[in-house]
Amino acid sequence: MTTESALADGVREALSVDAEAFAERAAEEAEIVKQELRDGSFDNHQSIVGFEYEFYAVGDGRWSEESRAGEYALMRVPRRMLELMGFEKELGLHNAEMSTSPQPLSDHGLRAQLAEVRARLEAAENTAGVEGMRLVSDGLWTIPPAGETAREYLTDSAEVDGVTVAVNMSDSVRYHAMANADPDGTDRDGPDDARSADARVELSAPGVSLAAETVMPESLITSIQPHYQVAHAETLPRHFRYALRIAGPLLALGVNSPFFPPELYDDDWDGERVLDEGATENRIHVFESVLNARTDADKVRFPREFHDVETAVDRIAADETLIPMPDPGGSDRFDDAFGTFRTKHGSYWRWVRPVFEGASRSSANARIEFRPIPGQPTVRDSIAFQAAFAGLMQALAQREHPVIGLDWETARDNFYAAVADGLDAELAWVGRDGQRTTDTDALYDDLLDHAEAGLRTAGCADDEAAEWIAPLRWRVANRTTPASWKRDRVRDRLDDGDDFETAVVDTQREYIRQQAETLVDGGFSAWTGGD
């Protein structure tokens, strides 16, 4: 049996799962999770941090024909190479993902996270370099594979035994199954069943619209995801409410996807209009529009808060099921007792989300996954966001910071203002004195002071805490983000007479060249002559 036929069989199996029975099983297992919460199974003796880090591969022009054909053009990563790297597959064939080992929140724990990312990434780069490619940490790629257009790469699909398969997507049954289910969750009748217009995926962002048969356009984007395991599961709702209030301000510091591949822009959007009206963080638009096109409710969204932990469990169980995946079975994990519920985590696409799982009872945890931040220019900057998020989760709740009183609607508006304008956005905040402010310096002084304070309570010395947060303070002081760095260089190139496509592509190449020198051991501030 070919790989494609096996994938088609997997898709058909997924589409044959009874959606109602799946939902009933998830609801039943939610009761198991709630009982385990009452029994203290998800409690730990301290806070723990983890990290997910996504990359895409590009050609460096040294060896392979594909990489020589286009400097820093997107490249597909051979599956065997991913195994050699010790990385995991992601949506696109060009993607690679790393997940760190959970560590206690402390200076030693953060340094262990940093060391693990650096060691594994350096080894992966050495492996990739042999094949003439390198991994890029970024928010959204803009140079398609050599000899292909971005549109072709993102929309190419084929029929295999009556199943629609995205040619450049990894062999993830769930994602391929989305292309073969009608919007009401039912499967297609067969290879001759005509697809209706509303069954298509539509990527929609300022100046960009792209129709596709599959969710492959989501593979434009890459992210970092800090995780924070609470020590006591009953405190998760309070931590979650704080996480929603800091989502906008932290995203504003991290924006890094201001441009699409130039060919994807609508005809009436030239470079000037993109700079005037385009978003600084298009990754949010991509993920929301592509995946929300397949559901009745918007599964990808800024989430509502909850005030007790059982409500969080109920919301996950009741979330609209896109593809009711079959029970894989065959393992001996603690959370196999609620395997269907755990499956629903995978498509509980909220920008901040609660997760309940554990391979064993001793490792079971209740955590918050913080998903808004795009890939960053360097490892050091990426871990700065992990440290800031963890420090804020520690300090804001411990000190009962009054920003928890900021209404949810304003927290949501802050988030989408950051998507649009990054550090130039007007964000509302409630300071430690209880006064509401929109002053950027006052907001970030308070925010980052509390991030440092949280790290100190976790055992970091004063200078250690300051060191972890320093890359973010630099961004505030200099009003510079990765997105503004890219926008400034595109602006300069347009002013020098370049056309928009050349300006974007050459800026992307400059980004990757700078990153090649600083990704593992340097910092973003050095790109502009900072310390």
Please name every model-derived segment.
Residues T2-T214, L220, S363-A366, I383-A395, ...:
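Terminal catalytic/cofactor-binding subdomain
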Residues G59, P102, G139, D182, ...:
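Short, flexible loop/turn elements at secondary-structure junctions
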Residues S64-S67, D107, L236-R238, D296, ...:
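Short helix/loop capping segments that flank catalytic or ligand/cofactor-binding pockets
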Residues S101-G109, S223-Q229, I368-P377, G431-R436:
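Glycine- and acidic
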Residues A128-S137, G248-G278, A395-A418:
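Flexible helix-coil linker/hinge segments at domain or subdomain boundaries
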Residues T142-N365:
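Loop-rich catalytic cores of soluble enzymes, especially ATP-dependent carboxylate-amine ligases
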Residues R371-E464:
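Substrate-recognition/cap regions that form aromatic- and gly/pro-loop-enriched pockets
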Residues T457-D531:
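C-terminal amphipathic alpha-helical interaction region
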